[in-house]
Amino acid sequence: MRRIVAGKLHGIYVTDANLNYHGSITLDPDHCEEAGILPMEFVEIWNKNSGARISTYVILGERGSRCCILNGAAARTCQPGDQIIICNSIYIRESELPDIRPRVLTFDSDNRVLDRLEYIVKFDDFGRYRFAIERARSLNHASIAGEPKTVA
């Protein structure tokens, strides 16, 4: 099994840092659902301002708030206004790689979604990997395995 990117919140801005909370990162459920990030799921966080890299788990904040709050020890690594990348992952067999389409959301400075992208890996006629980034289809969540669900 290989660890593969499942979804990303790319360039989201930290809205608060709460050192006295028990830990985690608090995120808007709308962003999580669209990127396929689950509550209590462990995520990697990469701070574009400082280069800090940490791992923590997700808790859900207020829907529609566009929040991104680092809690507990994680609050020491990211400050309000920092731009970060949040990534979840899955373990799959290499043969399943062409079957997934990780969802990537990009953000403006107010944490509104700017773009919805999908990472795509296919094999060419010679069995070599080919990677592409495409605008996402109209999905209600990231497709981890099998066909994505289409929003009616």
UniProtKB/Swiss-Prot annotation:
<comment type="subunit">
    <text>Heterooctamer of four alpha and four beta subunits.</text>
</comment>
<keyword id="KW-0566">Pantothenate biosynthesis</keyword>
<protein>
    <recommendedName>
        <fullName>Aspartate 1-decarboxylase</fullName>
        <ecNumber>4.1.1.11</ecNumber>
    </recommendedName>
</protein>
<comment type="function">
    <text>Catalyzes the pyruvoyl-dependent decarboxylation of aspartate to produce beta-alanine.</text>
</comment>
<dbReference type="GO" id="GO:0015940">
    <property type="term" value="P:pantothenate biosynthetic process"/>
</dbReference>
<dbReference type="GO" id="GO:0006523">
    <property type="term" value="P:alanine biosynthetic process"/>
</dbReference>
<comment type="similarity">
    <text>Belongs to the PanD family.</text>
</comment>
<comment type="pathway">
    <text>Cofactor biosynthesis; (R)-pantothenate biosynthesis; beta-alanine from L-aspartate: step 1/1.</text>
</comment>
<keyword id="KW-0068">Autocatalytic cleavage</keyword>
<feature type="binding site">
    <location>
        <begin position="72"/>
        <end position="74"/>
    </location>
    <ligand>
        <name>substrate</name>
    </ligand>
</feature>
<keyword id="KW-0210">Decarboxylase</keyword>
<feature type="binding site">
    <location>
        <position position="56"/>
    </location>
    <ligand>
        <name>substrate</name>
    </ligand>
</feature>
<dbReference type="Pfam" id="PF02261">
    <property type="entry name" value="Asp_decarbox"/>
</dbReference>
<keyword id="KW-0670">Pyruvate</keyword>
<dbReference type="GO" id="GO:0005829">
    <property type="term" value="C:cytosol"/>
</dbReference>
<dbReference type="InterPro" id="IPR003190">
    <property type="entry name" value="Asp_decarbox"/>
</dbReference>
<dbReference type="GO" id="GO:0004068">
    <property type="term" value="F:aspartate 1-decarboxylase activity"/>
</dbReference>
<feature type="active site" description="Schiff-base intermediate with substrate; via pyruvic acid">
    <location>
        <position position="24"/>
    </location>
</feature>
<keyword id="KW-0456">Lyase</keyword>
<feature type="active site" description="Proton donor">
    <location>
        <position position="57"/>
    </location>
</feature>
<dbReference type="InterPro" id="IPR009010">
    <property type="entry name" value="Asp_de-COase-like_dom_sf"/>
</dbReference>
<keyword id="KW-0963">Cytoplasm</keyword>
<feature type="modified residue" description="Pyruvic acid (Ser)">
    <location>
        <position position="24"/>
    </location>
</feature>
<keyword id="KW-0704">Schiff base</keyword>
<keyword id="KW-0865">Zymogen</keyword>
